[in-house]
Regions:
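Compositionally biased terminal segments of proteins
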Residues: 1-182
Length: 182
């Protein structure tokens, strides 16, 4: 998809902000994240070109052919902690004609999902927390630099603590891709 996005927009770098961004740091994990049919992304250097990605968006010929699609977003789609841009991770990809995907650090990704607080985000965060690849203390620190009100901060802290307790009390188990770390 990155190659197609680059061909359409002339851009060489895209920021990926949705659940698929977990694959930059953990490419062989989290089958739950691979269930998503869309890739939430925007052009890094010329965000105004992002709208052109509708050509490979939902119900496009690209979507019909490959079964997945681009979901053009912008930098305000997800509420992220201060400094997230400096923590972006290069997605290891091949066959993209030099087009790069820059993905959220897993901690920033989870914070954005704690803010959104949709059922699918709650499930995703629990899966990632249970895997042990994120640190609850770091998540709690990021809550303090996330641009949300104090009510949202309290809710986020409560969910992080709850998810940490669930992860700590669960026996060593495989994530949906069959990997074990605990």
């Amino acid at each position: 998809m990155l190659r197609a996005a680059g061909d359409i927009t002339g851009e060489r770098q895209f920021i990926i902000i949705g659940s698929q961004s977990i694959h930059a740091k953990h490419p062989d994990r989290f089958a739950g994240a691979t269930i998503s049919l869309e890739l939430d992304l925007f052009a890094k250097n010329h965000p105004e070109r992002t709208e052109q990605l509708n050509a490979i968006g939902q119900e496009s010929r690209f979507h019909e052919t490959y079964g997945y699609y681009a979901d053009p977003v912008d930098s305000t789609t997800a509420v992220l902690p201060k400094g997230w841009q400096g923590r972006l991770i290069n997605m290891p990809v091949t066959e993209t004609n030099g087009v790069a995907g820059l993905c959220l650090d897993p901690h920033d990704l989870l914070i954005s999902k704690y803010v959104a607080h949709r059922e699918k985000d709650i499930d995703f965060n629990r899966e990632v927390m249970a895997s042990g690849v994120v640190d609850a203390e770091r998540l709690l620190a990021l809550v303090d630099i996330t641009p949300v009100d104090e009510t949202a901060r309290r809710r986020m802290r409560g969910y992080i603590e709850h998810d940490r307790r669930l992860a700590d009390s669960a026996p060593a188990k495989a994530d949906l891709a069959g990997n074990t770390d605990k």
